[in-house]
Design a protein with these regions (language model features):
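A short, flexible loop at the N-terminus of ABC-type nucleotide-binding domains that lies
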Residues: 1-5, 14-27
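The feature captures the beta-strand-to-loop junction immediately N-terminal to the Walker
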Residues: 41-43
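Helix-to-loop junction immediately C-terminal to a conserved catalytic motif
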Residues: 56
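Conserved ABC transporter NBD signature motif
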Residues: 64-76, 112
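Short coil-to-helix segment of the ABC ATPase nucleotide-binding domain corresponding to the Q-loop/switch region
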Residues: 93-102
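Conserved ABC ATPase "signature" region
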Residues: 104, 111-132, 184
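Conserved signature/switch motifs of ABC ATPase nucleotide-binding domains
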Residues: 135-138, 156
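Hydrophobic anchor residue at the start of the ABC signature
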Residues: 150
Length: 262
């Protein structure tokens, strides 16, 4: 049997503070195939971001491990790019230079100067930021900053793109536009994506599978919902789609039941 592209295997995570140990995650198992879009959803404090940070290599698991493309994750690496809710752009660099920093760090030896420039411009064009190469972060909107963050992550040629509530700080219209752009990028490039979200509609719209976490402490995966809506997905058409609303109700029901039990 073929190994999954990304495997989260029997992860536990505990933190000790002032002599007291708290178990945040217990026995988290998840297999992700190449090109899948996975969303993780759950109530605040259920360890969603902890799972993502362990996959990113920013946190070590207390037990278990993460296997990506046949290799164990042991710390951060360029094969896993992360996009945060906060765009994390360097304010003293232009849009182009913010992406250039990452590209030069990874590809200065393997790409020529012209090739690197073309690659940077290509990734900024993917997120419709080709017109703003020379602008500074303070000169562009929040949605544009997040576009640059996504372009920078894609320019690193990651095996997995990790998204930690990437649209959470944006207004509804900007969020919808960016969601549509991410769907198009994933369709065109076939990226493997793993996203943390609190937004049920976002999870159903974007995902191939939705991973629903139980409440903490000792949170784990409660249910996994396969979202079999055909792609490409049109948010307007889906608003009245019975299947879309079935998936939406299933996630809301899980979250409501977990909240009631908590």
């Amino acid at each position: 049997m073929a190994q999954p592209y990304l495997s989260i295997e029997h992860i536990d995570k505990s933190f000790t503070r002032n002599g007291l140990t708290s178990t945040v995650l217990r026995d988290v198992n998840l297999k992700i195939e190449h090109g899948e879009y996975i969303s993780i959803i759950g109530h605040s404090g259920c360890g969603k971001s902890t799972v993502l940070n362990i996959v990113a290599g920013l946190l070590d698991p207390s037990l278990g491990g993460v296997i990506l493309d046949g290799k164990e994750v042991r710390g951060p690496g360029p094969d896993r790019s992360m996009v945060f809710q906060n765009h994390s752009l360097l304010p003293w660099l232009t849009v182009y230079e913010n992406v250039e920093v990452a590209v030069n760090k990874l590809f200065k030896r393997s790409m020529g100067k012209r090739e690197r420039r073309d690659w940077i411009e290509h990734n900024l064009a993917l997120v419709n930021m080709g017109h703003a190469l020379n602008k500074y972060p303070q000169e562009i909107s929040g949605g544009m900053k997040q576009r640059v963050g996504i372009a920078r992550a894609l320019a690193m040629k990651p095996k997995v793109l990790l998204l930690d509530e990437p649209f959470g700080a944006l207004d509804a219209l900007t969020r919808a536009h960016l969601q549509d752009e991410v769907m198009k990028i994933q369709k065109d490039l076939g990226n493997t994506m793993m996203m943390i979200t609190h937004d049920v509609d976002e999870a159903v719209l974007l995902s191939d599978r939705i991973v629903m976490m139980t409440n903490g402490p000792s949170a784990t995966i409660g249910e996994i919902l396969d979202v079999k809506l055909p792609r490409p997905r049109d948010r307007i058409a889906l608003a009245d789609d019975p299947e879309y609303n079935h998936y939406r109700r299933a996630v809301l029901s899980f979250l409501h039941e977990r909240h009631r039990l908590h």
